[in-house]
A protein has these predicted regions:
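Carbohydrate-interacting regions of secretory-pathway proteins
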Residues: 31-212
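N-terminal, post-signal-peptide region of Sec/Tat-exported proteins
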Residues: 55-81, 85, 242-277
């Protein structure tokens, strides 16, 4: 696999200097009842306490929410500016826990919105800069689900023996606070709310067995923020776009799913511009890269540049030329 991109923007962790503030905020908030929707509106900004469900963070600013959470469902909306990035941390004490990335824009090797940082990194954004988009983060037992708008982009089950590098040694589930951290530019949030889930809550849709990370190579790349992308996936042999979606989330591999434009290929075939646009409408909101493979010799004349230009990338090979 070629390293086409370099993630050159590592994000520091919150740091132990604010761990005491997290504990202080947790003490201010009652445990709450499972199933009760709570506005996430009490934050500590350094030494200052603020009340809002619409916070914004800029580079170097961290907001710590009151409360301690185990199983939960957190919902809200986010707005990114071009080049801006922020993180939502959970199960954190200032050093531990996971983070969800908020960053949009072109496919350029940076981690995109919905990434479970350094565990399930995503490289194609389903949201746009300058537009509000919904998100949801749910923790049930050992399972973490992240949604961008209505699309599930991460479904990760922490195995019994998770692999973590020294830098991510405390990137583990447990319980703890929620935090927002600015990385660069400004990211705004609104309508933040959190629902406590019972201790026995489980994701019934999580039917695939957890990956054994003691022997898994993908998690080793993910922990080092090395882009793990398979650009050449075809929908054939029983592989549907829905199954590709599930497999991508389970194995931690970003799939580039490509139909065949032209003649002579195997799998999903596109015959003209109309079929190109119809296919792209099907997959545009799915969390994988959208490529297209030119087949045969006629595809450059059969399809317009405008139609092929809707895809993230185009490639061809000489293995199945029939004309």
């Amino acid at each position: 696999m070629r390293n086409l991109f370099c993630h050159s923007n590592p994000v520091p962790r919150i740091g132990t200097t604010i761990a005491a503030a997290l504990l202080s905020l947790a003490a201010l908030t009652a445990c709450g009842e499972a199933g009760a929707l709570e506005p996430l509106d009490r934050w500590r900004d350094g030494e200052r306490e603020i009340r809002t469900t619409a916070p914004a963070v800029t580079a170097g600013r961290t907001l710590l929410a009151a409360g301690d959470y185990g199983n939960f469902r957190l919902t809200g909306e986010a707005l990114t500016q071009p080049g801006a990035q922020a993180a939502l941390l959970f199960h954190t004490d200032g050093e531990s826990g996971y983070e969800v990335v908020f960053r949009n824009g072109a496919i350029d090797g940076t981690r995109k919105s919905g990434s479970l940082a350094s565990v399930r990194n995503l490289y194609r954004s389903l949201a746009d800069d300058g537009e509000w988009f919904g998100f949801e983060v749910t923790v049930r037992g050992r399972n973490i689900v992240v949604r961008i708008d209505t699309t599930e982009v991460v479904c990760y089950t922490e195995p019994e023996h998770p692999y973590r590098t020294q830098a991510h040694a405390r990137q583990l589930l447990g319980h703890g606070a929620i935090a927002l951290r600015g990385v660069q530019g400004e990211v705004a949030f609104r309508n933040l709310a959190i629902e406590r889930l019972g201790a026995q809550a489980r994701n019934e849709a999580d039917t695939l067995p957890p990956v054994d990370e003691r022997t898994d190579g993908v998690i080793r790349f993910q922990q080092r923020d090395f882009p793990v992308i398979d650009y050449h996936v075809h929908l054939k042999g029983g592989l549907t776009k829905e199954r590709a979606h599930a497999m991508s989330m389970n194995y931690g591999i970003n799939y580039g799913v490509a139909p065949n434009a032209g003649e002579g290929g195997v799998g999903r075939m596109l015959a003209d511009d109309g079929e190109v646009y119809a296919y792209f409408d099907e997959v545009e909101r799915m969390p994988f890269l959208c490529g297209v493979q030119g087949e045969g010799r006629k595809w450059t004349a059969t399809f317009s540049q405008e139609a092929l230009g809707v895809f993230d990338y185009l490639f061809t090979d000489a293995m199945t030329i029939i004309d």
